[in-house]
Regions:
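Helix-to-loop junction immediately C-terminal to a conserved catalytic motif
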Residues: 68
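Conserved ABC ATPase signature
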Residues: 154-158, 162
Length: 277
């Protein structure tokens, strides 16, 4: 005989699901009268990775910029940890950006500062750490991305892949709950893309943050995604688990998958991120 569940156990079973950390609901935005995103909805639960896929110009990066508060939607709701951000002032968004950060395509590193000083910059801006604590955290972050050998060099001497790894370290200095990545594999070869994917996945598992990754690289997305949002002509053609996306018979999705140039993991080898892209 099985024991009957207690009232407490039943309450836990029937409880409302956890509120998504990101809730992007019926969002539309147009530039100069041209629709960029139309009625797009998705959500991400804490600890998940969402990959936003689609061809160039479909509004993938625009979605990230709205999550950061750099752009305001014309219609719809954007909530981060239950807080509506579309009506916040710039001061209110600065508070939100302590919990959500973005790794830009170009890395947005300071060319005049060494790798160490780039990573230290946001830590010093916090204002609650002494210099010894700053340097301890810098060493830890640089170690997490495997950049110990380039701490004293300027970003201009780094490969594209190494710049992106350093940019990730700097983004993590804010101890964010959500990390947004804008096309992290653009202008890198498949080997470096693989290692960037491994790095992002390893950091997520170690630190537990939520990730949203914009990419057109399906092989990269397969390594990372719990959820997929596929955009076509500014509309959400698919939102759901990776497995469902791969099995979809939607003609636009099948065309996207057919056009993607796959490189099998077995072909990539084990080249480190120090390889110049």
């Amino acid at each position: 005989m099985f024991d009957s569940p207690s009232n407490e156990e039943l309450s836990r079973t029937l409880a409302e699901p956890e509120e998504p950390i990101i809730d992007f609901s019926h969002v539309s935005i147009a530039f100069d009268g041209r629709p960029v995103l139309e009625d797009v909805s998705f959500y991400v639960n804490r600890g998940q990775t969402l990959c936003i896929l689609g061809r160039s110009g479909v509004g993938k990066s625009v979605a990230l910029r709205m999550l950061m508060g750099f752009l305001k939607p014309d219609e719809g709701s954007i909530r981060i940890e239950g807080q509506e951000i579309t009506t916040l002032s710039e001061e209110g968004m600065r508070a939100i950006r302590k919990r959500i950060t973005m790794v830009f395509q170009n890395g947005a590193l300071f060319d005049s500062l060494s790798v160490r000083e780039n990573v230290a910059f946001p830590l010093r801006e916090r204002g609650d750490l002494n210099e010894e604590q700053v340097q301890e955290l810098v060493d830890r972050l640089i170690g997490l991305v495997g950049a110990e050998d380039v701490v004293d060099v300027l970003p201009s001497s780094l490969s594209t892949g190494r710049k992106r790894a350093v940019a990730i370290a700097r983004a993590l200095a804010a101890q964010p709950e959500v990390v947004l990545y804008d096309e992290p594999t653009t202008m890198v070869d498949p080997i470096i893309a693989r290692h960037l994917g491994d790095l992002i996945q390893r950091l997520k598992q170690k630190l537990g943050f939520t990730s949203i990754v914009v990419t057109h690289d399906m092989r990269f997305a397969e390594r990372l995604a719990d959820l997929v949002l596929f955009l076509h002509q500014g509309r959400a053609q698919f939102f759901g688990p990776l497995k469902g996306f791969m099995a979809s018979q939607d003609p636009h999705i099948r065309q996207f998958l057919a056009l993607d140039a796959y490189v099998l993991p077995s072909e990539l080898g084990d080249s480190p991120l120090v390889t110049r892209a």
